[in-house]
Amino acid sequence: MIDCMRVSLALVLVGSLGMTACASVAGEPLASQVQSASMGTPFTLKPGETARVTSEQAQVRFDRVTADSRCPRNVQCVMAGEATVRVSVTLRGQAERTLELRTTPQDEQTTAGDYLLKLADLVPLPDAGRPVKPADYRATFILTPAPK
């Protein structure tokens, strides 16, 4: 009985160490979740992914879609609806800022430091009666210098 408990405890400890080894360090995204992006060029992210604009020392992480009331595909709606995405932005080593962007023209972009971050696209559209699974979203962003 005691040997069985020791084996179980050993398995739990080994599993915990394995999961810890896969975690990111100090909030930094894993290398597989970071893609390179260029200033002024659209880049597309899945939830949890980060784009790094090295020339500007900027990072944009697509955290998640917080709301999606857009008109479903193959449905005729009176209003188009909107979706809201949450992003985390880090500029030149400063503290991370959390921002929200919407798919409506008046709220699709915001200023982050000396930059303008625009939500250029969010796919897929929902299907009637079936919401989009969070992991299926893809958001396209563009980072440009803010107008002076």
Regions picked out by a protein language model, each given a short descriptive name:
Residues 120-148:
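C-terminal partner/receptor-binding element of secreted or periplasmic proteins
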Residues 23-26:
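Bacterial signal peptide processing site
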Residues 81-94:
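Iron-sulfur (Fe-S) cluster-binding segments and ferredoxin-like electron-carrier domains
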Residues 29-80:
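N-terminal secretory signal peptides
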Residues 1-11:
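Bacterial N-terminal signal peptides that target proteins for export
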Residues 103-121:
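Short Fe-S-cluster ligation motifs
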Residues 18-21:
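C-terminal motif of bacterial Sec signal peptides marking the signal peptidase cleavage site
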Residues 76-84, 134-139:
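Short coil-to-beta strand junction motifs in C2/discoidin
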